[in-house]
Amino acid sequence: MAVYSRAYDEKFPVVCMDEKPVQFFEEARKSFRSEHTGICYEDNEYIRNGTCSIFLFTEPLRGWRYADAQERRRKADWAKQIDWLLTVQYPDAEKVVLVMDNLNTHTIGSLYETFPPEHAFALANRLEILYTPRHGSWLNIAEIELSALGRQCIGTQRIPDLETLKNLLVPWATDRNLKQRGVSWHFSTDDARTKLRRLYPVLQV
């Protein structure tokens, strides 16, 4: 939580990252819209068409976010997202402070398994990784952005494939970035010590 209280510094941006699985569904029967009422009718039957993973990055203090969908969430997929983040989005940053969940793919080792040692070292040297606690993923602001993405971009519609999803993600992120939609985070370390006091160890003297 203390990292969210840091002043904005473009050389050391605080970026939050999270992932979201998405299932693809094709319509068993084509939907249609009534000419009289304008209501769209969908058949309850659908065909499962695989899954994918959304990778989302957000820099709360800048009001920026980026979402991309990939077929899988392997170590190499995460590593390639980090490579893009550092070389394309933040080429001039000295070090990116990256807040994320402690998943088995979210490690420096994933960089070395994906890229040549020299490039992996260069990427790792520009990262300051902060993992959220095991049961504290809600501390990751990227979860808030994923929630907004779910409501505003995906909703209840049936998405048939990866290309369709990618075509939805780009305008959603672009619109929120243009409107500078940020996150107002007020839960501080002092708040945690008060409201979550039962989770802190008690020193016996």
Describe each region flagged by the PLM.
Residues 11-12, 62, 93-95, 123-128:
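Short glycine-/polar-rich loops that comprise or flank the Walker A/P-loop
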Residues 16-18, 57, 63, 82, ...:
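Mobile genetic element proteins and their domesticated derivatives, centered on retroelements
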Residues 28, 164-205:
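C-terminal domain-tail junction helix/linker
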Residues 41-46, 119-141, 157-159:
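RNase H-like polynucleotidyl transferase catalytic core
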Residues 76-97:
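Short, basic/hydrophobic alpha-helical segments
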Residues 93-107:
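Acidic/histidine-rich, metal-coordinating catalytic segments
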